[in-house]
Amino acid sequence: MSSLREIILDTETTGLDPQQGHRIIEIGAIEMVNKVLTGKHFHCYINPERDMPFEAYKIHGISGEFLKDKPLFHTIANDFLKFIADSTLIIHNAPFDIKFLNHELSLLKRTEIKFLELTNTIDTLVMARSMFPGARYSLDALCKRFKVDNSGRQLHGALKDAALLAEVYVALTGGRQSTFKMIDKPNEINNLTVKCIEVQKIKRSIVVKPTKEELQKHKEFIDKILIQA
């Protein structure tokens, strides 16, 4: 049986509309295989080549000064596209992130690059609206509903929010499978941090209830991302 690779993804931006000159400033993406968080993730801050509006700064706390020495999007594009290749993207309010990512890709003016498609995404906002009509659907609201600890989320952050969304997505789809074993092997690639892990062999077709030890390892992994982001 083939593995199901999903990427939980989030971005932070300078504003709401790329057509008004707004750009992506942070990308966070976390790998999940057969509903198991593998520990592998992609994270990068990006120099937007423009100022940071105060309204955006109040949301994520990322300043223009902080981003001055960060890479431009074109320098990290290949690594990002390689990381998400052949995977379903899990995004909360997918049209927003896809719109911004495709705008950044269009600025590269590289004909060989294909734009991202909404048909290859799962929108957790749409899922939540379908499952809980009339409820609140923000990430914070869903964390509260599923008892996901978001106490450290004072400001938005792409990797932090992707980690929280991973927990929410697993809850929305009925629970996690098996476990993983962390192996710390950080590699710095164009200001990206990729951590490798060893996934234990599992029975792909069986959903199992996690043990206390597995839940603790899972919590430690999420906490590690929240601290590093």
Swiss-Prot record:
EC main group: transferase
The keyword Zinc is assigned to this record: no
Cofactor info, note text: Binds 2 divalent metal cations. Magnesium or manganese.
GO annotation terms (biological process): DNA replication proofreading
Domain of life: Bacteria
Key words, A-Z: DNA replication, DNA-directed DNA polymerase, Exonuclease, Hydrolase, Magnesium, Manganese, Metal-binding, Nuclease, Nucleotidyltransferase, Transferase
Cellular component GO terms, alphabetical: cytosol
UniProt-annotated catalytic positions: 156
Catalytic reaction list: DNA(n) + a 2'-deoxyribonucleoside 5'-triphosphate = DNA(n+1) + diphosphate
GO molecular function, one term: 3'-5' exonuclease activity
Role, per record: DNA polymerase III is a complex, multichain enzyme responsible for most of the replicative synthesis in bacteria. The epsilon subunit contain the editing function and is a proofreading 3'-5' exonuclease.
Protein name per its UniProtKB record: DNA polymerase III subunit epsilon
